[in-house]
Swiss-Prot record:
SUPFAM superfamilies: Nucleic acid-binding proteins. One of its GO terms (molecular function) is translation initiation factor activity. One of the essential components for the initiation of protein synthesis. Stabilizes the binding of IF-2 and IF-3 on the 30S subunit to which N-formylmethionyl-tRNA(fMet) subsequently binds. Helps modulate mRNA selection, yielding the 30S pre-initiation complex (PIC). Upon addition of the 50S ribosomal subunit IF-1, IF-2 and IF-3 are released leaving the mature 70S translation initiation complex. Component of the 30S ribosomal translation pre-initiation complex which assembles on the 30S ribosome in the order IF-2 and IF-3, IF-1 and N-formylmethionyl-tRNA(fMet); mRNA recruitment can occur at any time during PIC assembly. Keywords: Cytoplasm, Initiation factor, Protein biosynthesis, RNA-binding, rRNA-binding. Disulfide bonds: none annotated. It comes from the Bacteria. It comes from Solibacter usitatus (strain Ellin6076). It is found in: Cytoplasm. Belongs to the IF-1 family. This is Translation initiation factor IF-1.
Length: 72
């Protein structure tokens, strides 16, 4: 799947799970599970509850995503 196939949305982190997953509420009130992208993990970007983030969702499964950017 190429980058053009993914859906990019923004949301707010609700909670962090011990396994590295995050519960994120999207702008349109949907809650999805997301994990950090490798670039964020490699640069040790901290994501906490309440942070605004940008997600990539697969068009095949809209319940799981990847956090690609943390807004300030």
């Amino acid at each position: 799947m190429s980058k053009e196939d993914s859906i990019e949305v923004t949301g707010t982190v609700l909670e962090k799970f011990p396994s590295g997953l995050f519960s994120v509420q999207l702008e349109h009130e949907r809650v999805v599970l997301a994990h950090l992208a490798g670039r964020l993990r490699r640069n040790r970007i901290r994501v906490l509850a309440g942070d605004k983030v940008t997600l990539e969702l697969s068009p095949y499964d809209l319940t799981k995503g990847r956090i690609t950017f943390r807004h300030r």
